[in-house]
Amino acid sequence: MEKNLPDIFFFPNCVNVFSYKYSQDEFSNMSKTERDNFSLAVFPVIKHRWHNAHVVKHKGIYKVSTEARGKKVSPPSLGKPAHINLMSKQYIYSEYAISFECYSFLKCITNTEINSFDEYILRGLLEAGNSLQIFSNSVGKRIDTIGVLGNKYPFSKIPLASLTPKAQREIFLAWISHRPVVLTGGTGVGKTSQVPKLLLWFNYLFGGFSSLDKITDFHERPVILSLPRIALVRLHSNTILKSLGFKVLDGSPISLRYGSIPEELINKQPKKYGIVFSTHKLSLTKLFSYGTIIIDEVHEHDQIGDIIIAVARKHHTKIDSMFLMTATLEDDRERLKIFLPNPAFIHIPGDTLFKISEVFIHNKINPSSRMAYIEEEKRNLVTAIQMYTPPDGSSGIVFVASVAQCHEYKSYLEKRLPYDMYIIHGKVLDIDEILEKVYSSPNVSIIISTPYLESSVTIRNVTHIYDMGRVFVPAPFGGSQQFISKSMRDQRKGRVGRVNPGTYVYFYDLSYMKSIQRIDSEFLHNYILYANKFNLTLPEDLFIIPTNLDILWRTKEYIDSFDISTETWNKLLSNYYMKMIEYAKLYVLSPILAEELDNFERTGELTSIVQEAILSLNLQIKILKFKHKDDDTYIHFCRILFGVYNGTNATIYYHRPLTGYMNMISDTIFVPVDNN
């Protein structure tokens, strides 16, 4: 039976929902329907108040051990109370008295149907729920939320659309149905910042029970929010931690999981019902230890994120609920309808808090003339920034396709504009320091960025977006620039309009936009390895299926040729990055080498032992020809001589001209083969 969420269990958004304690007099004046709403309190009360509790006698009154201290005693036999004392909150019998809560504690036994609860039980659940602070009302104060989840400070005031009573009820119905849920909403409605918090709340109250119709045993598991990048894990976990009234992780319901996590970001007292913010790769290592799985930024089609969707769909009986969150379904709606079993689609209507104006700057050059198109684009960008300039003390973001273009455009703009220029992308280590400069500067700041800033960092003083409309899509041993998809455009545009009115200036024709099938330009070994680990049937169990299946089967044959057992592969997947699949051959040789190779993958520190080991794999590349690019760079046109992509052409930059062969150490390190 589908349960609607009674308003007394809404999450306190501190706008029109507040934490509240109900009195017995209020209960007496309620309708039967309103009283029956308190029956659902039995689930959080059993989990968080009555678990391991017992009956005590305190000053001659039977109470629950969570109410008062006293000697453990055998419970009395319960009939209908002779008298109700609302002042003392006790039921009076001829020979004894018992607290409302203790009466309910004794009556709420396994397999009892909650619709059988009478007024006597409901009064006790009201008292127990008040003690847990699980109830809410449309009146109250922010300060009343202190202590709800053990927090020392009040919850934040959140006026966003995702925490309105209507949205809360809709999300709860989808969550409790155990159907896969696809949740969309405009940028600024609070998808990532609020919906995970709401699901944490539902999990705290009702998670772990197989049904909300009757009392059963429960299996408490946390929620996980799986994200494609460490920056997002840190950003969103910190946002939700603060909004729940915590200043430190320890003892809060918030935990983080990602590779090489620093000690200070480990919650040493996590909550069983809590929420874990994790990178996709670490989410997969313990996927079924979570009750509710939230996968964010679905539109990005991060490889491991798509694999999580496939695994969760294949083994949907092992999880309670799956939420896929994305700003837009422009590219994926039809596939999701087919792929997911009976999915629920939820859209949270709403827009950014402030208006966003759009400006189109036409490029008269056809994109097929790449160099001329970019030169015209840079000239247009200077003109646009001069015409549509952020106010003093504010910033604008220029979206370009690659790290190399960040430097190219910054150099071009610095010579022509009097503003502060910065670069931010995924490989920049001092982003916080850069942002401090941006926020403290009285001048105009222009930030040049890759698609990294579409979601990974929120710039609070940004008022203008200048979008070149392109993205670099990596491919095995190369990659190419492509025009963005509709969902990427929505993400970029949504960077403004959150704090102040914004302007979105775009420099590309909308007809150039197209969906990007990332799987067609990826190494496919992870799909093979995780399919083996989770018993996926290829290719039909994949969320996105490669256009060229021959590459998938060649990858499978290549992996099989390593002669590594499935059990060993599973251990490697759980413990190492394996940025190049060939590294697996080295990880299985010795623990000492594995430790050094792992350190190289994490830090880039290349020891002689690791270099010699990788060279022994003979990952050769043949140099076909080269040409001079600039003072210290030569472009080498090469051919791959190993692996699935044997025969594929690649372009490699090196500081001097080379002939003959190179050995590949990593995707960025190459060693010339000594011809002597």
From Swiss-Prot:
Pfam families: DEAD, Helicase_C, NPH-II. It is an enzyme of class 3 (hydrolase). SMART domains: DEXDc, HELICc. GO terms for cellular component: virion component. GO terms for molecular function: ATP binding; helicase activity; ribonucleoside triphosphate phosphatase activity; RNA binding. Keywords: ATP-binding, Helicase, Hydrolase, Nucleotide-binding, Transcription, Virion. Residues 366-535 form the Helicase C-terminal domain. It is found in: Virion. Its EC number is 3.6.4.13. Residues 172-347 form the Helicase ATP-binding domain. InterPro entries: DEAD/DEAH_box_helicase_dom (IPR011545), DNA/RNA_helicase_DEAH_CS (IPR002464), Helicase_ATP-bd (IPR014001), Helicase_C-like (IPR001650), NPH-II (IPR021892), P-loop_NTPase (IPR027417). Its main location: virion. Gene3D superfamilies: P-loop containing nucleotide triphosphate hydrolases. It comes from the Viruses. Belongs to the DEAD box helicase family. DEAH subfamily. NTP-dependent helicase that catalyzes unidirectional unwinding of 3'tailed duplex RNAs and plays an important role during transcription of early mRNAs, presumably by preventing R-loop formation behind the elongating RNA polymerase. Might also play a role in the export of newly synthesized mRNA chains out of the core into the cytoplasm. Required for replication and propagation of viral particles. This is RNA helicase NPH-II. It comes from Monkeypox virus. The lineage of its organism: Viruses, Varidnaviria, Bamfordvirae, Nucleocytoviricota, Pokkesviricetes.
